[in-house]
Design a protein with these regions (language model features):
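Structural signal for hydrophobic packing residues in well-ordered secondary-structure cores
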Residues: 12-15, 26, 30, 48, ...
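Acidic-glycine-rich active-site phosphate/pyrophosphate-binding loop
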Residues: 25-43, 115-121
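Phosphate-handling active-site elements
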Residues: 29-39, 65-88, 156
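RNase III-family endoribonuclease catalytic core
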Residues: 52, 78, 93-94
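C-terminal binding/interaction regions
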Residues: 86-160
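Glycine/serine-rich anion-binding loops at beta->alpha junctions
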Residues: 16, 44-63
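Polybasic, low-complexity association/targeting segments
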Residues: 1-14
Protein backbone atom coordinates (compact mmCIF):
# COMPACT_ATOMS: atom_id res chain seq x y z
CA UNK A 1 0.00 0.00 0.00
CA UNK A 2 1.10 3.54 -0.67
CA UNK A 3 -0.49 6.95 -0.27
CA UNK A 4 -2.21 8.50 -3.26
CA UNK A 5 -0.31 11.68 -2.51
CA UNK A 6 2.99 9.77 -2.82
CA UNK A 7 1.80 8.14 -6.05
CA UNK A 8 0.99 11.58 -7.50
CA UNK A 9 4.40 12.97 -6.54
CA UNK A 10 6.06 9.90 -8.04
CA UNK A 11 4.20 10.48 -11.33
CA UNK A 12 5.30 14.12 -11.41
CA UNK A 13 8.90 13.11 -10.79
CA UNK A 14 8.62 10.68 -13.72
CA UNK A 15 7.80 13.62 -16.01
CA UNK A 16 3.99 13.74 -16.02
CA UNK A 17 2.51 17.21 -15.63
CA UNK A 18 0.83 18.33 -12.40
CA UNK A 19 -2.68 17.61 -13.63
CA UNK A 20 -1.72 14.16 -14.90
CA UNK A 21 0.01 13.40 -11.61
CA UNK A 22 -3.10 14.17 -9.56
CA UNK A 23 -5.60 12.51 -11.90
CA UNK A 24 -3.36 9.46 -12.26
CA UNK A 25 -3.45 8.85 -8.52
CA UNK A 26 -7.23 8.39 -8.69
CA UNK A 27 -7.65 6.05 -11.69
CA UNK A 28 -8.94 3.29 -9.42
CA UNK A 29 -11.82 5.39 -8.10
CA UNK A 30 -12.77 7.23 -11.30
CA UNK A 31 -12.78 4.08 -13.42
CA UNK A 32 -10.25 5.30 -15.99
CA UNK A 33 -7.41 3.37 -17.51
CA UNK A 34 -4.10 5.07 -16.74
CA UNK A 35 -3.38 6.05 -20.37
CA UNK A 36 -6.90 7.45 -20.75
CA UNK A 37 -6.45 9.61 -17.64
CA UNK A 38 -3.05 10.81 -18.86
CA UNK A 39 -4.51 11.90 -22.20
CA UNK A 40 -7.44 13.67 -20.52
CA UNK A 41 -5.20 15.62 -18.13
CA UNK A 42 -2.40 16.28 -20.64
CA UNK A 43 -3.77 19.70 -21.65
CA UNK A 44 -3.97 21.12 -18.13
CA UNK A 45 -0.34 21.09 -16.95
CA UNK A 46 1.38 24.38 -16.25
CA UNK A 47 -1.90 26.19 -15.74
CA UNK A 48 -3.50 24.95 -19.00
CA UNK A 49 -0.89 24.19 -21.65
CA UNK A 50 1.77 26.10 -19.72
CA UNK A 51 -0.14 29.39 -20.04
CA UNK A 52 0.03 29.73 -16.23
CA UNK A 53 -3.73 30.10 -15.70
CA UNK A 54 -5.64 27.87 -13.25
CA UNK A 55 -3.31 25.38 -11.58
CA UNK A 56 -3.36 21.97 -13.25
CA UNK A 57 -3.84 20.28 -9.89
CA UNK A 58 -7.11 22.19 -9.49
CA UNK A 59 -8.26 21.12 -12.94
CA UNK A 60 -7.59 17.51 -11.94
CA UNK A 61 -9.41 17.91 -8.61
CA UNK A 62 -12.45 19.31 -10.40
CA UNK A 63 -12.40 16.53 -13.03
CA UNK A 64 -12.33 13.92 -10.26
CA UNK A 65 -15.18 15.64 -8.42
CA UNK A 66 -17.19 15.88 -11.63
CA UNK A 67 -16.67 12.21 -12.43
CA UNK A 68 -17.64 11.17 -8.90
CA UNK A 69 -20.51 13.50 -8.13
CA UNK A 70 -21.19 15.72 -11.12
CA UNK A 71 -24.62 16.23 -12.62
CA UNK A 72 -25.86 14.64 -15.83
CA UNK A 73 -29.37 16.01 -16.11
CA UNK A 74 -29.74 19.65 -17.12
CA UNK A 75 -31.43 20.76 -13.94
CA UNK A 76 -30.69 24.06 -12.24
CA UNK A 77 -30.67 22.58 -8.72
CA UNK A 78 -28.16 19.82 -9.55
CA UNK A 79 -25.95 22.27 -11.43
CA UNK A 80 -26.05 24.78 -8.57
CA UNK A 81 -25.22 22.11 -5.98
CA UNK A 82 -22.30 20.85 -8.04
CA UNK A 83 -20.95 24.34 -8.68
CA UNK A 84 -21.23 25.12 -4.96
CA UNK A 85 -19.20 22.00 -4.17
CA UNK A 86 -16.53 22.87 -6.75
CA UNK A 87 -16.37 26.42 -5.41
CA UNK A 88 -15.86 25.04 -1.89
CA UNK A 89 -12.98 22.89 -3.17
CA UNK A 90 -11.49 25.91 -4.91
CA UNK A 91 -11.82 28.11 -1.81
CA UNK A 92 -10.18 25.46 0.37
CA UNK A 93 -7.31 25.03 -2.12
CA UNK A 94 -6.82 28.80 -2.28
CA UNK A 95 -6.88 29.12 1.52
CA UNK A 96 -4.21 26.43 1.81
CA UNK A 97 -1.99 27.53 -1.09
CA UNK A 98 -2.62 31.25 -1.52
CA UNK A 99 -4.01 31.13 -5.07
CA UNK A 100 -5.60 28.97 -7.76
CA UNK A 101 -3.45 30.56 -10.46
CA UNK A 102 -0.31 28.74 -11.59
CA UNK A 103 1.66 31.93 -12.26
CA UNK A 104 0.89 33.28 -8.79
CA UNK A 105 1.75 29.97 -7.14
CA UNK A 106 5.08 29.86 -8.95
CA UNK A 107 5.89 33.53 -8.37
CA UNK A 108 4.96 33.62 -4.69
CA UNK A 109 6.23 30.23 -3.55
CA UNK A 110 9.01 29.20 -5.91
CA UNK A 111 12.68 30.04 -5.59
CA UNK A 112 13.18 30.41 -9.30
CA UNK A 113 16.70 30.77 -10.56
CA UNK A 114 17.82 32.36 -13.79
CA UNK A 115 18.50 28.88 -15.18
CA UNK A 116 14.85 27.82 -14.84
CA UNK A 117 12.38 29.05 -17.44
CA UNK A 118 9.10 30.04 -15.83
CA UNK A 119 7.70 31.33 -19.11
CA UNK A 120 4.37 30.59 -20.66
CA UNK A 121 5.45 29.40 -24.09
CA UNK A 122 4.49 25.93 -25.29
CA UNK A 123 8.01 24.49 -24.94
CA UNK A 124 8.24 22.04 -22.05
CA UNK A 125 11.12 22.42 -19.63
CA UNK A 126 13.66 19.66 -19.25
CA UNK A 127 13.05 17.92 -15.94
CA UNK A 128 16.25 18.43 -13.96
CA UNK A 129 17.14 18.61 -10.29
CA UNK A 130 17.05 22.41 -10.61
CA UNK A 131 13.58 22.26 -12.21
CA UNK A 132 12.15 20.36 -9.24
CA UNK A 133 14.08 22.37 -6.63
CA UNK A 134 12.89 25.69 -8.00
CA UNK A 135 9.16 24.92 -7.99
CA UNK A 136 6.53 24.37 -5.29
CA UNK A 137 4.71 21.88 -7.52
CA UNK A 138 5.44 18.74 -5.49
CA UNK A 139 3.94 20.18 -2.32
CA UNK A 140 0.97 21.57 -4.25
CA UNK A 141 0.37 18.18 -5.89
CA UNK A 142 0.49 16.49 -2.50
CA UNK A 143 -1.92 19.02 -1.02
CA UNK A 144 -4.34 18.73 -3.96
CA UNK A 145 -4.50 14.95 -3.52
CA UNK A 146 -5.01 15.21 0.25
CA UNK A 147 -7.73 17.85 -0.26
CA UNK A 148 -9.47 15.73 -2.92
CA UNK A 149 -9.41 12.70 -0.63
CA UNK A 150 -10.80 14.75 2.26
CA UNK A 151 -13.59 16.47 0.35
CA UNK A 152 -14.69 13.39 -1.60
CA UNK A 153 -14.20 10.93 1.29
CA UNK A 154 -11.64 8.86 -0.60
CA UNK A 155 -8.96 6.98 1.33
CA UNK A 156 -5.44 8.27 0.70
CA UNK A 157 -4.20 4.65 0.65
CA UNK A 158 -3.89 2.90 -2.71
CA UNK A 159 -2.59 -0.46 -3.91
CA UNK A 160 0.78 0.27 -5.48
Amino acid sequence: MMKRSEKAKELFLKGYNCSQAVLGAFCDVIGFEFDQAMRLASSFGGGVARMRHICGTCSAMFMIAGLMRGYTVHEAKAKSEHYAFIQSMAKEFEARNGSLICRELLDSRAKLSKTVDNGSGPEANERTTEYYRARPCLSIIEDAVILTCKMLSIPNEIDA
